[in-house]
Amino acid sequence: MEQIVSSLWSDCLNHLQTKVSPIDYSTWLRPLQASFANEELTLYAQNPFVENWVKDKFLTEIIDLARFLSKNEQLKITIRVGNKPTEQNLSASSTNKEELTQDTVHKFKTGLNGRLTFDNFVQGKSNQLAKAVAQQVADNPGESHCNPFSLYGGTGLGKTHLLHAVGNEILKRNPQARVVYIHSERFVQDMVKALKNNTIENFKKFYRSLDVLMIDDIQFFAKKEASQEEFFHTFNSLFERNKQIILASDHFPKNIENIEERIKSRLNWGVSTAIEPPELETRVAILMKKAEERNVELPEEVAFYLGQKLRTNVRELEGAINRVSAWCNFTKRQITIDAVRETLKDLIASYDHLVTIENIQKIVAEYYNIKMADLKSKSRTRSIARPRQMAMALAKELTSHSLPEIGREFGGRDHTTVMHACKTINELRDTDNSIQEDYTNLTRKLSS
């Protein structure tokens, strides 16, 4: 039974690691110990502070996840302070096979997080199109022009949130709908288990009987030929019956490596929408929203400071709020810029080291195949001026330097020149797909 406990809690941690920030995972979840007895999973925290924090922030999700993974709706999960007992009387199931059937899975295992909705999704320029399409899919699941619906973008930008929001909205309108959200790795694991237990027909029947199938991180299907084969036939079965398919990946579907061309072709049948890294205003709005959800009083000037310093993704913004909140609760200090600077000094230092104006100039010059000196020159030719404007806009977005400081790094230009460059690039991103693609590619390079 110890092996069963270890496997269940390990599976829970693997799933939680994809849903929370690295900071939250390493600080609050990974150190927890687990034991199992009398149909109860007990988690052990190192002190009362950790116990209360996990209870408030993560226990509901842990309960849902543990019941889903154990296929036991009655499983009881508690958390207490202490260490895991060295010897336990553990009760085990007498069955070795876990059949994946429509009745046992769909009854309570949609995989959805009910807290991830459209209402608490913070919209900005970087994600407004993705949210609009997601809402359209939720309104009319299965419509041909949005089926399949593919979301793509970097880690922690809100793809998973939108998938859950679509599923929750569909179930809200039609509680009888068969809706399942699943990570691609879980799809693979379920298939392997079904093959091992000789229940592959139940596996096929379940997935092909759904009304809405949402698979996250489909890039993990790469090089898994058997899983791709099964997904291909599942896709065809659902599509032919006008059932909604929603997928998320870290790259534009046709650019995912080691995925069969016939699958890529089908992903192009519907609509693919990117989610970009959030701009400053959206980052600030996200920070304020996350603070409000946690009943944390976050001064606006602190939110702007954090928004300027942390520029990569939503997950890290949320992790920063959790870390600052925990520190201030523990020390009984108010959240100030000085407190944030002290608490997140390692994280902020890593960003400051990663994204500098010089680094931006280097990456932009390489991308456009020009010299760094060209960006600082007086040349006004289009082949030089446009990359220079792009570099200025990126410097404004990805660093905390002022406009005059940015101008000085580009050949001593005036701050009004930098303002004009930022305005030009922002306008072109709305009208010129090639500029938008360049901006996205450069942002990813600078944030990776």
Swiss-Prot record:
Gene Ontology molecular function: any one: DNA replication origin binding
SMART domains: AAA (SM00382), Bac_DnaA_C (SM00760)
Subcellular location: Cytoplasm
Superkingdom: Bacteria
Region of interest (Domain I, interacts with DnaA modulators), ranges: 1-93
Residues engaged in binding ATP: G156, G158, K159, T160
Family named by the database record: Belongs to the DnaA family.
Quaternary structure note: Oligomerizes as a right-handed, spiral filament on DNA at oriC.
Name of the featured protein: Chromosomal replication initiator protein DnaA
Organism in which the protein naturally occurs: Haemophilus ducreyi (strain 35000HP / ATCC 700724)
